[in-house]
Amino acid sequence: KAADRIYGEGLGVSWSITEKSCIDAINELCYHIEAGIRVNRQTGLYEIVLFRDNWFEENEIHTISESKIKSMQYEITNADEVINQVNVNFYDRANIKNSSFSISESGLIQTLGRVNAETLDFPYFMNMRNAEIVANWKLKLLSTGV
């Protein structure tokens, strides 16, 4: 399901793995495609889970009863610490050079009265389109306090 979704989104990743552990390579891939990994208890195999707003159909969403939750911690984000801009670095294959651009949350910049930026590196994206898609997802997460 994850591979089909990534293909449909056109999120091509180009990279050569050398001298990395398998888990390190998987974690780097997950960073680029906004995903996580879990181990399937029945098979013992790793599974990639994409973090998307509409990843599950409504009938696939499971509810967890509060009695099943042993502990939960919320970390309240201070409004002054919310990220409202990301500076993105990627490799531009068409121009054969490293490139960068910025994406910002204008409303938050106005609210805070300043830019609070974080840098995202996507060395395995070879075009701005893919880096921009994932950077927007990451900015959405970073700019939303819990």
Model-inferred region functions:
Residues 1-146:
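C-terminal extracytoplasmic interaction modules
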